[in-house]
């Protein structure tokens, strides 16, 4: 039984969640990545901009004065004022950090090279902090990195400068107020110890023997999103932050807060932009910096409209968040998010498979017993019944299927990731050499995770969000009978100042789902024994829409089958729409009529519409418009097919302002190859010209699926994999061993296995989402979401000009050991 404190009253939570009705059934659990903006905030910003005229502050005094007022309001939010701190607007946390290191004076005297100060950073910092070391090296500063445990031990030790030498350099230490990796809160009450030299013993020997002046750079970006930074109680020299982390808006705007008594050490800023000088000669090396400190650092025109929106951001947050804890909205948010994360932690802590194996491996530095040490963040990985890890990419696909937004990977915190995953420096380098890159989907190497799953809560999250997430975990990943659980919600009783209200009891009853035991993820591939035929040809004229099934034969073009994925639907922002965002797309079923030379679009309940196939490029460019979009990071040149079909598609998919785009004939998108290999042209398909599906493997998979709710027959299940070439043979899985394929008179090269995502969980007849077959694919292939093989066209075997591939053609498969199977 989990006993928790409910912070925000149910009625208040209803008002808060109504601000985010646009989420629909999406469960957003990535507040550490970005806070969501409330609806009324955007409305109020819009109204403010429509009724006022804001000009460049270099031109308009009223705008400049308003910005100064907002500067004061932001400082007040952190319980300080302009007499103690100066606020410098930046483009974000990263620029704020960079501004400090670029301007920091490590040597007290420019001629004293021997006593240059040091740059000290915690190994578990965000990448943006670690990157500062490169600039510190350029300034001849000693660079020192400190491990997590060492840092905590040292900074909690009281120190006092005792050396008789007082001419040491200036030292800068950078650490986060809260880890963006797992939400651990680093001590803020130790700043005085740092300034008194508790880190001296980590410097070079000759620097240990002299007194250095220490300055603290606090990365507060993750902390201020859900916690109260009280600069009246703790006073770091420099604080960096981004406003979208707090308010959800605006992006591209941050701040550097500089303690007034530490301004003098930021004296080495070299570049100066518009608005930062009092006098300048362009024909002589002469300029005078602004007298007002923050004006020296805000190069060029400020992002004044974004800054002005901060007034509405503050007003909105103070309006919609009740002041439950210490009469403070940020304290309220802190407690609210902490108890949500603690609830999730408690539920996952006891989650086990049927054989007793723990299903969760946590990566924490606290146990959620102390809110001063932990934020509303939980980081972990999933473990299978046999003790092996489930890759975060596999998890991500399932989360997407359930409309749950989370963050996976290392979260730009290599140090924390390395420490918690127990990876050596050699391990990290070996992973890179094996092909793993930051931000990619390579989640397991040698069965070891390369990253983790991070859940983070905002003030708009509820216990229902926790339930939805836990139910997804139980349904998809835990081989166990879900237990009935009770959660007791108590009213919060920390201090007499807090407003009390009656609690209630909510019962969480998780679904009981039958799960198959995974005995062995090693797949036995049977030997080839019988013939193979091409059973069916399918093309998908419009990317991510329904299939056009061909009964006889079809022409092979330079990019794949003719008319296969030659069109795509784009949103009003130019981004390609797929079934992941709109499952109704599968019910748009194109037909290619070669006699009439048209493509006919069909959709249930709508009159079909046709568009011509053979308009010349000149005609299309005359009547349509040339446009650009992206498919799998590739820029695509396309032709807009006009308003009539655009309106038809928009009505069918119930999304406004959609457009149908046809790939331009002179678009040269190609298959990613090594430099010395011939590049094959690609249509709008994701990764290859053709996708082959073996029906025997589909049948094998169907027999492995044990979910009683999944009722697809063999043909419907095959349709989910959206293959171009559907083959029939007796053996399952053998296609995974092929090197190349000869179908009739045409040779194809195997380009690898097809990676799968939640698209296969969309019923191609109805657009409904299911958990299967992705879950079983992951189970059977050890977490590797691969099904089907990619092919590229080589040419005809007899060197003829024949370009027609016919159904029921015989197939010869060449195995990886060069044996030919028939």
UniProtKB/Swiss-Prot annotation:
Record-linked InterPro entries: Aminotrans_V_dom (IPR000192), MoCF_Sase_C (IPR005302), MoCo_sulfurase (IPR028886), MOCOS_middle (IPR005303), PyrdxlP-dep_Trfase (IPR015424), PyrdxlP-dep_Trfase_major (IPR015421), PyrdxlP-dep_Trfase_small (IPR015422)
Name of the top EC class for this enzyme: transferase
Hydrolase listed as a keyword: no
Pfam family membership, one: MOSC
Keyword Transferase tagged: yes
UniProt keyword annotations, A-Z: Molybdenum cofactor biosynthesis, Pyridoxal phosphate, Transferase
Modified residues (N6-(pyridoxal phosphate)lysine): 245
GO biological process, one term: Mo-molybdopterin cofactor biosynthetic process
Cofactor: pyridoxal 5'-phosphate
Catalytic residues (positions): 412
Domain MOSC intervals: 658-814
PROSITE patterns assigned: MOSC
Family named by the database record: Belongs to the class-V pyridoxal-phosphate-dependent aminotransferase family. MOCOS subfamily.
Role played: Sulfurates the molybdenum cofactor. Sulfation of molybdenum is essential for xanthine dehydrogenase (XDH) and aldehyde oxidase (ADO) enzymes in which molybdenum cofactor is liganded by 1 oxygen and 1 sulfur atom in active form.
Descriptive protein name: Molybdenum cofactor sulfurase
């Amino acid at each position: 039984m989990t006993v928790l404190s409910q912070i925000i009253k149910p009625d208040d939570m209803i008002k808060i969640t109504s601000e985010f009705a646009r989420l629909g059934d999406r469960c957003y659990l990535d507040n550490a990545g970005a806070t969501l903006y409330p609806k009324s905030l955007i409305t109020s910003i819009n109204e403010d901009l429509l009724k006022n005229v804001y000009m460049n502050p270099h031109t308009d005094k009223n705008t400049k004065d308003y910005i100064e007022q907002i500067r004061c309001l932001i400082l007040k939010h952190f319980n300080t004022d302009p007499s103690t701190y100066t606020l410098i607007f930046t483009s974000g946390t990263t620029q704020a950090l960079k501004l400090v290191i670029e301007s920091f004076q490590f040597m007290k005297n420019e001629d004293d090279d021997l006593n240059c100060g040091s740059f000290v950073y915690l190994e578990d910092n965000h990448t943006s902090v670690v990157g500062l070391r490169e600039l510190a090296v350029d300034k001849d500063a000693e660079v020192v990195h400190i491990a997590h445990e060492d840092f905590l031990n040292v900074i909690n030790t009281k120190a006092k400068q005792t050396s008789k030498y007082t001419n040491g350099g200036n030292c800068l230490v950078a650490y986060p107020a809260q880890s963006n990796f797992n939400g651990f809160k680093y001590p803020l009450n130790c700043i005085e110890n740092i300034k008194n030299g508790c880190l001296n013993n980590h410097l070079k020997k000759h620097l240990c023997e002299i007194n250095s002046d220490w300055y603290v750079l606090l990365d507060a970006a993750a902390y201020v999103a859900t916690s109260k930074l009280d600069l009246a109680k703790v006073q770091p020299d420099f604080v960096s932050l981004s406003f979208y982390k707090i308010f959800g808006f605006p992006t591209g705007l941050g701040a550097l807060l500089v303690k007034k008594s530490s301004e003098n050490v930021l004296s080495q800023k070299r570049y100066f932009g518009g608005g930062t000088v009092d006098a300048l000669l362009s024909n002589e090396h002469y300029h005078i910096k602004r007298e007002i400190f923050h004006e020296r650092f805000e190069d060029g025109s400020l992002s004044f409209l974004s800054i002005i929106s901060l007034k509405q951001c503050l007003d909105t947050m103070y309006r919609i968040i009740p002041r439950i804890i210490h009469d403070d909205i940020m304290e309220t948010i802190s407690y609210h998010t902490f108890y949500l994360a603690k609830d999730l932690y408690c539920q996952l802590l006891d989650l086990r498979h049927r054989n007793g194996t723990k299903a969760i491996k946590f990566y924490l530095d606290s146990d959620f017993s102390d809110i001063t040490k932990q934020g509303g963040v939980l980081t972990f990985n999933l473990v299978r019944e046999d003790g092996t890890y489930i890759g975060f990419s596999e998890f991500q696909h399932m989360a997407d299927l359930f409309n749950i937004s989370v963050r996976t990977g290392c979260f730009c915190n290599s140090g924390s990731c390395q420490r918690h995953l127990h990876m050596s420096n050699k391990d990290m380098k070996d992973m890179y050499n094996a092909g793993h890159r930051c931000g990619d989907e390579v989640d397991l190497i040698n069965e070891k995770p390369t990253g983790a799953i991070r859940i983070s809560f905002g003030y708009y999250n509820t216990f229902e969000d926790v339930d939805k997430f836990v139910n997804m975990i139980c349904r998809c990943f835990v081989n166990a009978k879900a237990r009935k659980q009770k959660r007791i919600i108590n009213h919060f009783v920390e201090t007499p100042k807090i407003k009390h209200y009656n609690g209630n009891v909510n019962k969480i009853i998780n679904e009981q789902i039958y799960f198959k035991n995974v005995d062995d993820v090693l797949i036995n591939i049977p030997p080839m024994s019988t013939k193979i035929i091409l059973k069916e040809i399918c093309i998908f004229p419009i990317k991510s829409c329904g299939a056009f099934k061909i009964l006889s034969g079809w022409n092979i073009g330079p990019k794949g089958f003719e008319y296969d994925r030659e069109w795509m639907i784009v949103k009003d922002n130019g981004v390609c729409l797929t079934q992941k965002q709109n499952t109704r797309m599968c019910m748009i079923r194109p037909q290619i009529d070669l006699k009439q030379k048209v493509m006919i679009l069909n959709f249930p309940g709508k009159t079909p519409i046709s568009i011509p196939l053979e308009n010349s490029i000149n005609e299309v460019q005359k009547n349509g418009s040339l446009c650009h979009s992206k498919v799998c990071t590739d820029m695509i040149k396309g032709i807009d097919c006009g308003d009539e079909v655009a309106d038809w598609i928009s009505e069918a998919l119930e999304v406004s302002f959609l457009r149908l785009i046809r790939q331009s004939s002179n678009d040269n998108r190609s298959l990613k190859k090594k430099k010395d290999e011939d590049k094959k042209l690609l249509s709008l398909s994701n990764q290859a010209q053709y996708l082959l599906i073996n029906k025997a493997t589909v049948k094998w998979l169907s027999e492995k699926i044990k979910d009683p709710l999944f009722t697809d027959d063999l043909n419907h299940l095959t349709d989910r994999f959206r293959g171009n070439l559907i083959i029939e043979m007796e053996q399952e899985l053998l296609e995974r061993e092929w090197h190349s394929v000869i179908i009739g008179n045409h040779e194809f090269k195997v380009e690898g296995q097809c990676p799968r995502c939640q698209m296969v969980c969309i019923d191609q007849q109805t657009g409904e989402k299911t958990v299967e077959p992705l879950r079983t694919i992951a189970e059977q292939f050890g977490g590797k979401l691969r099904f089907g093989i990619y092919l590229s066209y080589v040419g005809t075997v007899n060197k003829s000009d024949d370009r027609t591939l016919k159904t029921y053609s015989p197939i010869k498969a060449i195995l990886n050991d060069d044996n030919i199977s028939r």
